[in-house]
UniProtKB/Swiss-Prot annotation:
GO terms for molecular function: L-malate dehydrogenase (NAD+) activity. Homodimer. The gene is mdh. Keywords: NAD, Oxidoreductase, Tricarboxylic acid cycle. Catalyzes the reversible oxidation of malate to oxaloacetate. It comes from Klebsiella variicola. Its EC number is 1.1.1.37. This is Malate dehydrogenase. Substrate binds at R51, R57, N89, R123.
Length: 232
């Protein structure tokens, strides 16, 4: 199911339905997301305003926090057992809002709430592959710290068979942390990353489904609540 307040959403679903796959697609629009959420096992939230040049992710909080809160309230009522992936920026705070809404509704499960940071991983894979002359399919960079600028931390030392100088580590880390800004500035006010984010969201969602279906060894990085001293 696809859902957005925009009336174009059912038309997008029709467009997608013409692609020859086994997936059945329905589109829903309007203020009520309930019809799209009924029976859902996985919900990915990407709704919200996009960055413009000169903005950072935290500038989106005032608008996007309310959007996430509203959607998660509807999830808590309609499909409280669903796994939720939050893509909406700023991820490090919208995930916390989602957690508080779910706690208030009495349905919070930290093992089912994820801040989707896969975009940082695919960017890291691309940049490392370019630098080292490898195929991007050969590289998998674990990235921790969520998705808020300087908190994005690629673990470059954990890539098998690849080594870096201190300068390469510094340059790569900075580029990965600022890759979103690179896209925003290149689009000159026309929005932020959409196509690469779509690929990242699809990868994370499909990994989640594969794991839920019992496949072993499925590993993805995400922004989640831990078990340590600083866990919420």
């Amino acid at each position: 199911s696809l859902y957005d307040i925009a009336p174009v959403t059912p038309g997008v679903a029709v467009d997608l339905s013409h692609i020859p796959t086994d997936v059945k697609i329905k589109g829903f629009s309007g203020e009520d997301a309930t019809p799209a959420l009924e029976g859902a096992d996985v919900v990915l939230i990407s709704a919200g305003v996009a960055r413009k040049p000169g903005m950072d992710r935290s500038d989106l909080f005032n608008v996007n926090a309310g959007i996430v809160k509203n959607l998660v309230q509807q999830i808590a009522k309609t499909c409280p057992q669903a796994c939720i992936g939050v893509i909406t920026n700023p991820v490090n705070t919208t995930v916390a809002i989602a957690a508080e809404v779910l706690k208030k509704a009495g349905v919070y499960d930290k093992n089912k709430l994820f801040g989707v940071t896969t975009l940082d991983i695919i960017r890291s894979n691309t940049f490392v592959a370019e630098l080292k002359g490898k195929s991007a399919t050969e590289v998998e960079v674990p990235v921790i710290g969520g998705h808020s600028g300087v908190t994005i931390l690629p673990l470059l030392s954990q890539i098998p068979g690849v080594s870096f100088s201190d300068q390469e580590v510094a340059d790569l880390t900075k580029r990965i942390q600022n890759a979103g800004t690179e896209v925003v500035e290149a689009k000159a006010g026309g929005g932020s990353a959409t196509l690469s984010m779509g690929q990242a969201a699809a990868r994370f969602g499909l990994s989640l489904v594969r794991a839920m279906q019992g496949e072993k060894g499925v590993v993805e990085c995400a922004y989640v609540e831990g078990d340590g001293h600083y866990a919420r």
